[in-house]
């Protein structure tokens, strides 16, 4: 049996829509072992699909298929702390767990880049799947089946605080709220801030983060789906947050704070 620990992720980070993400200290732990049948359970008694529709199983089988290996079944034991449909990369975490677990069971025929490419190809969001694999702060894009990515060190003086509401918001619904055409000015607005965000996090220019997490492409359309979302962002900043934004498609909100201010915020 192998164990895979995968972190939650926060994608977009305001200005970096579909391109920037960071791993958080909230984890799913998944145990996998080969079996002659499918045996899937959850340690906490939560409902999980117990057949071939289980995402972890599907992704594990994809690895076996890619490597030309037969798979009769798997034992999968899930211990998941990442809440589903809250904008914290729960689907990416399951995708990565299935791929990495199967790869470990097979003796790691896929190298790290192949794992990253396959996860993004299956999941469709390299800004979630890449930091889920590499950890830390990542910039990533998927092109022709290959993920071009950079893992960048983050200045050590900050923490990330996550506000997780008690309601769900599907990625499909959040994406449906977005316009099909964007204004050139809005594109430039985000491009400048995404570059500033990456540079500021890595150099410690923390005074830039409020501006750098600004966004015109997705948050203005999604706040209407998140009760009190804009109020939470405003209040977090009033209490000293350096920046705040919708995590992924929402509805969770993330605030960037100085280390030591986490409990206060």
Placement of each model-derived feature along the sequence:
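Active-site rim beta-loop-alpha module in soluble metabolic enzymes
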Residues: 164-224
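ATP-binding N-lobe of GHMP and related small-molecule kinases
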Residues: 1-86, 100, 104, 108-110
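Glycine-rich, charge-dense phosphate/pyrophosphate-binding loop(s)
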Residues: 201-265
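Gly/Ser-rich oxyanion-binding loop with an adjacent helix/lid
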Residues: 70-148
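Short beta-strand-to-loop capping motifs
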Residues: 34, 165, 255-259
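A generic local secondary-structure boundary/capping motif
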Residues: 18-21, 120-130, 147-153, 198, ...
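Glycine-rich beta-alpha junction loops
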Residues: 26, 36, 136, 164-169, ...
């Amino acid at each position: 049996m192998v164990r895979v620990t995968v972190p939650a992720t926060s994608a977009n980070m305001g200005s970096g829509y579909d391109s920037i993400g960071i791993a958080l200290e909230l984890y799913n732990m998944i145990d996998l072992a080969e079996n002659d049948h499918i045996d899937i359970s959850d340690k906490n008694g939560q409902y999980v699909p117990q057949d071939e529709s289980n995402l972890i199983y599907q992704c594990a089988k994809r690895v076996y298929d890619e490597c030309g290996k037969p798979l009769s079944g798997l034992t999968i034991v899930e211990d998941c702390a990442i809440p589903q449909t809250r904008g914290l990369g729960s689907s990416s975490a399951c995708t990565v767990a299935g791929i990495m677990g199967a790869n470990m069971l097979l003796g790691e025929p896929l190298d790290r880049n192949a794992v990253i490419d396959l996860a993004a190809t299956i999941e469709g969001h390299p800004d979630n799947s890449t930091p889920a694999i590499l950890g830390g702060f990542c910039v990533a894009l998927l092109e022709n089946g290959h993920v071009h990515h950079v893992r960048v060190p983050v200045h050590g003086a900050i923490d990330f605080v996550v506000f997780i509401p008690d309601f769900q918001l599907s990625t499909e619904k959040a994406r449906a709220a977005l316009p099909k055409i964007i204004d050139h000015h809005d594109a430039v607005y985000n491009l400048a801030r995404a570059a500033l965000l990456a540079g500021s996090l890595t150099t410690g220019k923390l005074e830039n983060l409020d501006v750098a997490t600004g966004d015109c492409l997705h948050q203005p359309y999604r706040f209407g789906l998140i009760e009190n979302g804009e109020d939470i962002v405003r209040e977090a900043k009033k209490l000293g947050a350096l920046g705040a934004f919708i995590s992924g498609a929402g509805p969770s909100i993330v605030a960037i704070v100085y280390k030591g201010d986490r409990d206060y915020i």
